[in-house]
Amino acid sequence: KYTDANDNGKWDDFREPEEFSAYIQNTFEVPWMVINYGVRIDMVDYNSQVWSDTLGKFSPGRPWFYSDLNDNDVWDRGIEEASDIAGLARQKIMLKNSNWSYKISPRVGFSHVITDKSTFTFNYGLYFQNPIYQNVYLNTNSLEDPEELFEEGEGAVGNATMNAQRTQQYGASFNVQVGENWAYSVGAWVRDMDQLTRYTFERSGVYQYQVASNGDYGSAKGLDLTLEFRWAFFGSQLQYTYSVAKTNSEYAWASISGQYVDAPSQENLAYYDRPHDLTYYLYTFLPGGIQAGLTAFYQSGYPYTPIIFRGKDPAEDARHPNSKRGPAYKNVNLSFSKYFQMMDHKFSLGLNFFNLLDIRNAWDIYALTGKPDDPGTYYTNYVGLPGTDPNGAGVYADKSSAYYDRPWRLSSPREINFFIRIDFD
């Protein structure tokens, strides 16, 4: 005997979700304005089962039990007892098949001519993304036995009633040409994210567990500036973005190992927040038909939660998540190339300098010091000859001097590549 969750007439150890999407898009043009507009529909049925209550409604956070006295796999209302606490005679669980859910997302954008050398653009879009299936189906093969699930399934349950994650985005910009060679643009954008996946604490009898749900949220906003210069043999562009990204949780599973707090959530800097982003590139033609290009890039470091001392031992500063920032990323690349034709074939020779200034950027850091190559004296005090106290700190060394030599925490040094390319007709 088995539960046919896929409704395909046989037992299987997988799920077969169904997705459907369609969109309509159109463009309206007049001499002074262009409008793009459209609408999209997304539908999904996870083809799974969900706990339900005595009213036949979904109850993904709490199982309901009933006494199946006549063993017909159906709760006979008014005859058989039902409760949200386990322990009934001939106990069975109330389940309900998942349904189709749909989301409609409109998008619109327009570009309006202000003068013969300036335009104004605006865009709005509503976007949906289905949750990761892992968070939908996690441990749902044990829904019929909640007690076993709570005891052996690490207390986490998927949820086939979750909605798609939603993002609303607005953006506007002015684009202006100055003279024959210069142009600039100023733009601003806002992105609101909600209905993101998280795990919420639930209780059933003596058991405490976590159920996937749409509870997390975040936001991002930014300002874009672009300055461009073009000439017959020279061109360059400078792009700068200032932005702030915040979320109430770093990722869906962050609450799995967290401590339950009965208090309103709040936004903190997202782990991918980079407030300053600066890019510059130029290209030109040198004597002899040589093309040259240079790119330079600067980006703020990522935020991280600092390590503080609570007594003698270090611990994560949970009260101030992502309150410190790692080193910034900096890079400069230079390239030269020359094209010529010989024997009815096109040839090109080139020389690329990656990381021209030989800057060793930090990919990862130690949260105690904020440095990629120094974990802090609390840890380096254990480096030395075994059984000795090399720094007089009252601790005995048990690690070699190479233990914290981890070059992969830094980016690659300068790299010079020479190449030859042949194009065959």
Where does each model-flagged region fall?
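Signature of Gram-negative outer-membrane beta-barrel scaffolds
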Residues: 1-115, 131
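Residue-level signature of outer-membrane beta-barrel architecture
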Residues: 26-30, 41, 102, 110-113, ...
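Transmembrane beta-strands of outer-membrane beta-barrel proteins
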Residues: 35-39, 120-122, 184-186, 236-238, ...
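Gram-negative outer-membrane beta-barrel transporters
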Residues: 44, 181-306, 421
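Membrane-embedded beta-barrel scaffold of Gram-negative outer-membrane proteins
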Residues: 113, 119-121, 125, 131, ...
